[in-house]
Amino acid sequence: MIDTTIFQDKTAVYYTLGCKLNFSETSTIGKTLKEAGIRTARKGEKADICVINTCSVTEVADKKCRQAIHRLVKQHPGAYVVVTGCYAQLKPDQVANIEGVDVVLGAEQKGELMNYLGNLEKHPQGEAITTAAKDIRSFSPSCSRGDRTRYFLKVQDGCDYFCSYCTIPFARGRSRNGRIEEIVEQARQAAAEGGKEIVITGVNIGDFGKTTGESFFDLVKALDQVAGIERYRISSIEPNLLTDEIIEYVSRSRAFMPHFHIPLQSGSDDVLKLMRRRYDTALFASKIRKIREIMPNAFIGVDVIVGTRGETEEYFEDAYHFIEGLDVTQLHVFTYSERPGTQALKIEYVESPEEKHRRSQRLLVLSDEKTKAFYTSHIGKEAWVLMEKSKAGTPMHGFTDNYIRVEMDHDDQLDNQLIRVRMGGFNEEGTALKGVLV
């Protein structure tokens, strides 16, 4: 049993890098510490505890993590510093050797962070406590409110896919999940707190159910029945796991929005094989067609990686033309970053940084064209928009069911409200459509 009396009136600062899943987990850690009497430090206040939740998706992410640790150690002298997350799991000794770090916790230990605070006495040398990826078994449920109106609900963790370029299975372990009844209860709690929108998050959420004998489709149907939650968004789902059954259900669902985020990674079948992805372009195209047939106005976001090992100019051109022909809304373009220990390093063909940048820019231009065309097609139409809080005197923003960003004049009473809006032209920045109350 932890003696929490030593934590009374202590303060903590939290810093999160990376994905929405990390933000959800940090929020849960914060709630646990709050229950023990530790409050979040105010802006500019020196904290007693620093919790840093890291990312390691790219080499740049690793660098940002190190910079964040150094910065927080400097800003909060004498604070007890805990580092967790993917970078901590993959390179624990490297993190432990950073001056000022006290404890490094791996994926298995993250959910029990309270147990590693001790009496908050600084360590002369950072201590790394991790579990090998193959032995990571725990699943820590979390549901957090983002900076705006959305809650992020963690339903699954880990991945069994072992794509050639990716370290996530080594950072988060094998695929595992919570039980539907537990997850539904968290959604009910979000509704009780006034939440109206939930984003379903995980590492490979379509793989949900592997550890409980349930299915992602079962989860979707159960969540759709939670009173008070007006909107659900599926954060990202593998194309081979996005079944017609799920697509059809979303099209007639009470609360699941016509909004999909589907990782393509490459539009070249040759590159997909090198990546060890579990689908080809024909399957991906069939999923897009299926969505468009029954939800013509759906927002479809697509992840693409450029410059992977083995991606020749010919393969990239194949990929570009395939993506150009897809009826999708937006591309999330990532430049390939070599990760230690991945199978991709065995592929000999390597592109220059300059060529990677050129390819990235071409796809970003294509993405802008597709997004602008999608927004333009909705000018003059009416839609329900969930508004988000903004600073006084600044425009307010919100999103339609199909994820079009709408800008409105400031009105505090609109915060977290669903309002009927007619969409006009673009705002000055070209990032949203101007809305007028109907």
Predicted regions and their residues:
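Proteins enriched for Cys/Gly/acidic motifs involved in redox and nucleic-acid/cofactor modification
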Residues: 1-201, 206-207, 221, 245, ...
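Conserved SAM/AdoMet-binding glycine-rich loop
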Residues: 81-82, 90-91, 192-314
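Short flexible coil/turn linkers enriched for glycine and charged/polar residues
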Residues: 146-149, 159-160, 256, 266, ...
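Hydrophobic, well-ordered secondary-structure elements that form the walls
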Residues: 262, 303, 323, 331, ...
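Contiguous mid-protein beta-loop-alpha structural module that forms a pocket-lining wall or clamp
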Residues: 311, 326-328
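Short, acidic/polar
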Residues: 315-320
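Short glycine-rich, low-complexity segments
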Residues: 329, 342-346
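Terminal RNA-binding accessory module
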Residues: 346-438
